[in-house]
């Protein structure tokens, strides 16, 4: 009797297992085991069988990566274990200081001998989007972005479309949360941009931007078409190890044994274990090193390889390898004490300076901008770069037609470093500052002793008007949600809005007719404008955009005078009576309100029903008059929230540390302000310390 063939269920299980193994060979080991055509044939066979037997289709089948129906919006996901960021190092001194802190702490805990060096696990710092994958009973249950570290966006449907992300793990704990990076290889990025351009669609500025934009598509079918990759580099919640796996014990201190929920006792060992489960782990360039010298050698070695890697990195990461030692070192603010990101310096490139144009800012500041032949630097294609001001152009001797060195300062703002003089052409031309504004034709003047030239057109100048309106609508001023740059451009270009007061006369009907504005958006914007008719007096004063008058100064002046009328009529002597207001600020306020047009705008605001509310007097506390400086990112409060609470308690907030500073409040990436505070003996608080000082 002939032996019966496999049942449909058995055939489907065999095909799935075979495809999963090929995926592991390809994405985890970077070692394809079959040609693409054979892999595609297996997928077609599986798709055909599942089409014949739809009752056998399960969510973890390789065929289910094609993408689900579009979403209306992303849901929120609360991370069971916060996704922390890392402290940064930018030079050798930072790395040596980190290694010393770690070694001193571990020696104090009896985990490191006096003649021993700390062993670190060194990894590449991938330049993509941080993601958390949650597996339950071995199946991918949820995927979320990092978000603010506490709460991210649910991108499960999109993550499922990435072929390198296993939908099922064999031998995994009951719950396993995997952290990693979604990115796009440079070659795939360039191919995607060519396709986008051929279709007349938006091109992306760099691989990270492309990866983030692809992952955050509301339609997973679009994400499925994008060449995304995933690499695991850490873990979050882990519990319920598989049966048969022995319990491992850690020794966080001599003579102390603690049962661990993890199967390995080193960071590198855990990454090996994740790879054994079938997760893609970027192990090729990872390495163990001892002490600061070893870390710096790794940094130098990877720096030389950086340009040859298929993907972008922006540094390397050092982690104490022993997990018991990590536990002893613990955390500070939003970063672990046992890990450090060592950033690469800003990248430089050479290109041609095609021309110099000027931009007009909110206060009329004229900024020269270099127009460049496109050049890829610091991870993006750069065509414009700042030249700061006329004096800088003269100092650097930059001329139109020069071959110039371009640097992405801080990896954000491109700047021209200087010319390559040996390549200067004979017809290179010196820059001549304009005498009239290119936008409104008003005279350009450069006040004595200032480096910045300015357009004298004021709000007559459309460029200044746009920037002034954008400033006024901002969160620290009138906080008009929905009134952004593109909308302001349309309103000013159409001559519908000539001053701040005109904003308050906008109707939902006319707003709905604008580009990218529907009826609902228009109604929401009108509602936001209505809410801004009773702002705090300080906010309205700040919204007017008076030069040298910042948020804190505006609030102090408002609190001192109590009404806009009294501020407008105040003499320079009266303004100087406001604490911390000097001659420059007092003179600027007087000149602003001496201009009839500016007083007219305030009157028009009143006619539109804008009635500022007096600033509340601060509660009488011991903080009255004390100056605080904020630096870094706090775990829970934004800088605006911390500022608001300090001001409400009668304190002041400054942007720089001095002998007059009462407290420095630090968060993640505190930087040079912390160093200066320590030099001056200024007390340093973290967020909890600030809350305690405020009695919260």
From Swiss-Prot:
Residues binding NAD(+): 36-40, 85-86, 123, 146, 181, 319, 343
What transmembrane ranges does the database entry give? Answer: none
EC nos: 6.5.1.2
Query: According to its UniProt record, which cofactors does this protein need?
Result: Mg(2+); Mn(2+)
Q: Name one GO cellular component term.
A: cytosol
Q: Which SUPFAM superfamilies match?
A: BRCT domain, DNA ligase/mRNA capping enzyme, catalytic domain, Nucleic acid-binding proteins, RuvA domain 2-like
Where are the catalytic residues?
125 (n6-amp-lysine intermediate)
The UniProt record lists the keyword Iron-sulfur: no
Gene Ontology biological process: DNA repair; DNA replication
Recall the GO molecular function terms of this protein's record. Answer: DNA binding; DNA ligase (NAD+) activity; metal ion binding
**Domain BRCT stretches:** 618-696
Alphabetized UniProt keyword annotations: DNA damage, DNA repair, DNA replication, Ligase, Magnesium, Manganese, Metal-binding, NAD, Zinc
Residues that coordinate or bind Zn(2+): 437, 440, 455, 461
Taxonomically, which superkingdom? Bacteria
Q: Please give the function described in this protein's UniProt entry.
A: DNA ligase that catalyzes the formation of phosphodiester linkages between 5'-phosphoryl and 3'-hydroxyl groups in double-stranded DNA using NAD as a coenzyme and as the energy source for the reaction. It is essential for DNA replication and repair of damaged DNA.
Q: Which family does it belong to?
A: Belongs to the NAD-dependent DNA ligase family. LigA subfamily.
What is the protein name for this chain? DNA ligase
- The encoding gene: ligA
